[in-house]
Amino acid sequence: MAKLAEQQIHRLTIEGYASGGSGVARLEGMVVFVQGGIRGEVCDVRLTHVGRTALWGRVHEVITPSPARVVPDCPHYGRCGGCQFRHMDYAQELEAKHTRVYDALTRLGGVEHLDLPPVLGSPKVDRYRNKAQFPVSRGPRIGFYQNRTHRVVDVPDCLLQSQAAGRLRQAVKEWMTAWSVPAYDEKSRLGLVRHLYVRTNRRGEALATLVTAT
């Protein structure tokens, strides 16, 4: 078989989930972390990174879909690294999180004979986060880092964040544009604004903090 390399496509079966929400498959004895995979699916996976002991990839095409697969309701999903589960239904998301905890306690923590109860679901599956940390880059782009990178994906509205956080994000973007306030650049180490940090409460009140280079 040819040497494993980035951009190759391999047909794999998703066996489980990793701690970051990616599906887990195996190829030539190596673990493959598959972005967008659901347990039980057969997928054509495009390799995005080849490491010495593990591989990373993303779903190129789903050959045998899981009944839990849904169409993501966020237009930025797949590029934005802010969440990992919008391609599966909520019941499967809870199973994936249960697997994460079980593996951490048994495989990493060494706990034996663990009877772990199911994850309790929330009645509120959107707009439940009360803290947002938005990285800022040239443009300005204000949103979240693309998966496994420091490239900022401009996200006007995150379905997991409060609407107040989204309005503050837009206000800061307009202020930076109107006053030519520069975003911080990690490579040149020039610029000013690095992050926008927002906390909200149940009354709809919000606290915004700008993290700057100086």
Which sequence ranges carry the predicted segments?
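Accessory RNA-recognition modules of RNA-modification enzymes
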Residues: 1-214
